[in-house]
Amino acid sequence: MAKAIPRRSSRRNGRIGSRKSARRIPKGVIHVQASFNNTIVTVTDVRGRVVSWSSAGTSGFKGTRRGTPFAAETAASNAIRTVVDRGMLRAEVMIKGPGLGRDAALRAILQSGILLTFVRDVTPMPHNGCRPPKKRRV
């Protein structure tokens, strides 16, 4: 019969404290994806590494309330609160999608005190690409 391999504790391999909070981010990029059902706000550094994120669903809104402007405003303020504590002063904003939370999220970003260098709409638009799905008959 095979000899049992003794299990070693994985504590020695794991990190004891989180090292993410030590990094200071003076400039970043705020990505807002506003769909009709939800709004997702992701804050990255200039290289594209995610620093903080939040969505209307993680902010406590469920169902159809996730698509509301108030939910988008709450999600944006939750995502930005952590990066303001880390020292973010300037940011670029990339807004994607047709949802109701576009303007509300931008309003929450402006109220946070971060200086915006530019706001860009990066909603993907087809140059007559794929055929769209057929119209709904309700």
Curated annotation (Swiss-Prot):
GO terms for cellular component: chloroplast; ribonucleoprotein complex; ribosome. Keywords: Chloroplast, Plastid, Ribonucleoprotein, Ribosomal protein, RNA-binding, rRNA-binding. Pfam families: Ribosomal_S11. The keyword rRNA-binding applies. Belongs to the universal ribosomal protein uS11 family. Part of the 30S ribosomal subunit. This is Small ribosomal subunit protein uS11c. It comes from Ipomoea purpurea (Common morning glory). The gene is rps11.
